[in-house]
């Protein structure tokens, strides 16, 4: 297949077929540079060479009643993670200050659990109001299944984006978790959209799904019209249902990122959890398809040193996208 020609067609408005999507995932490793060249043409058309940086604040760790097979915070997990209740507003603000100083444009407040309590939403809302005033960061909240009134409160507080991943295809969902449904996840994204918050929803690759499952989740996110799509690659943690699972290699991970770009050409594609473990030395190539990364640690696993990420972006000739307040602070 001529990947540059397909890229031009995508830029012109074509939506790729299932056969074309599978061709991306099944493409020969020898053609991977041509595939990524096409993905970069699409990425460059919409985002140039800018990269959005994101940072996670793990606001509540562990104690989750859900049985998600990939997650060390699940009630079914025996992984020896640090567990703590919802942190204070002051701790959230301290994290936002670090994000601002490290040129992170999007600050992600993430909490374990099925869904937030009224107190949790109040703490986040109060913190967000101050974050917007002091630092001007884009704020993404990820607090689980969300109710209408909670979404409205977060919107009024200034939350820009809400993350709730679909994680996998509808067909494969029951293999990953049984304590909530695929429809529960879709409904939360729809609630977020209804209340004017930008929807962020993505996938976890490497959970014993088929290639067709990967195509289906990429298309589902296209149909859901998620503005931001985090693509995670399973970092199998001992003590979870999926411990020992290692179905990925760096070349396949690049093909997955390319698929998400061809399928969702204008969206923010973020290389997320498992980037360092699964992409390895091919990490830089991922940014020819994606235009966003997490900097620093993830929820219960360590990420690459921030300085290594900054050096990687510099070596690639890419530019960090700053907020207006960061432009004023660092570029004046």
UniProtKB/Swiss-Prot annotation:
Function of the molecule: Catalyzes the conversion of dethiobiotin (DTB) to biotin by the insertion of a sulfur atom into dethiobiotin via a radical-based mechanism.
Domain Radical SAM core: residue ranges: 46-275
Binding site for [2Fe-2S] cluster: 108, 140, 200, 270
Family per similarity comment: Belongs to the radical SAM superfamily. Biotin synthase family.
Gene: bioB
Lineage: Bacteria, Bacillati, Bacillota, Bacilli, Bacillales
GO BP field: biotin biosynthetic process
Top enzyme category: transferase
UniProt keyword 4Fe-4S, yes or no: yes
Matches recorded under Pfam families: BATS (PF06968), Radical_SAM (PF04055)
Reaction equation(s) it catalyzes: (4R,5S)-dethiobiotin + (sulfur carrier)-SH + 2 reduced [2Fe-2S]-[ferredoxin] + 2 S-adenosyl-L-methionine = (sulfur carrier)-H + biotin + 2 5'-deoxyadenosine + 2 L-methionine + 2 oxidized [2Fe-2S]-[ferredoxin]
EC numbers, comma separated: 2.8.1.6
SUPFAM superfamilies reported for this sequence: Radical SAM enzymes
Reported cofactor(s): [4Fe-4S] cluster; [2Fe-2S] cluster
Protein name: Biotin synthase
Cofactor annotation remark: Binds 1 [4Fe-4S] cluster. The cluster is coordinated with 3 cysteines and an exchangeable S-adenosyl-L-methionine.
GO molecular function terms noted in the UniProt entry: 2 iron, 2 sulfur cluster binding; 4 iron, 4 sulfur cluster binding; biotin synthase activity; iron ion binding
